[in-house]
Amino acid sequence: VFLLFTIGTSIYAAIWPFFTVERFSWSPGMIGISLTIYGVCFAIVQGVLVRPAIKIWGEKKTIIIGFCFEFSAMVTFAFLTDGKILIILIPLASLGVLAQPAIQAILSKSVGDDRQGAIQGVASSLNAIAMVITPITMTWILAVFSDKTAKYYFPGMPFLFSALMVLLCLFIISRRKLASTL
C-alpha cells in the first residue's frame, strides 16, 4: 500500500508543470504560484491538521479520509478544463496529505523499538523506488494522451491512472488490518 500510494501521489512532482502547460497553457510563473499554494497548504495540513485528525479519527480512518481526498482531487484534476478552478481546489486536494503521516505512524507501531531504523529504511527505500517509477510512467502516459494526432487526446489520463492506484490502496486499507497491509 505504501509503495502504490507513493507512486500515485508522486504524480504532482512528476508531471505538474507538463500537465498544466498542456491543459491550461500556464506560464512558468503560474506554475510556480500553484506549487507555492500547494506547498503552503501541504505545510498547514502536516503541521496543524494531522495530529488532531489522528486523535479524532485514529490512524486507519485518517488514512481512509486522506485517500478519499486524494482520489477525489485526482479524478477532478483529470477532467478540469479551467486553471482557475484548479487553483481554487488545491487546498482541498492538499488534504490528501493526511494519509502519509498516519501510514508512517502505523509502520512505526508495527515493529519494536529495536527495528525502528529498519522500518524507516524500508519506507525510505520504497519512496525512492516510487520516485524512479513515477516520472517514467506518468510522463509516458501524459505524452501518449497529449499527442494531438493520437486517437484519444486526454492529458488528464495520468491523474486517472494515479486515482486508480489510490482507489486500490483505499480498497486494501479498508478491508484489512493495518499492520499486515502496509
Regions of interest found by a model, annotated:
Residues V45-E59, L142:
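Helix-to-loop junctions at the C-terminal end of transmembrane segments
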Residues L160-L182:
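Multi-pass alpha-helical transporter architecture, strongest
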Residues P28-G29, V111-S125, Y152-P155:
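Loop-to-transmembrane helix entry/capping segments in MFS-fold secondary transporters
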Residues K61-T76:
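Structural signature of the two symmetry-related core transmembrane helices
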Residues L98-G112:
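Intracellular juxtamembrane helix-capping segments at the cytosolic ends
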Residues A14-I31:
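Short amphipathic helix-loop junctions that connect adjacent transmembrane helices
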Residues T76-I90, A99:
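Helix-loop junctions at membrane interfaces in 12-TM secondary transporters
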Residues W140-V166:
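A membrane-interface helix-boundary motif in multi-pass transporters
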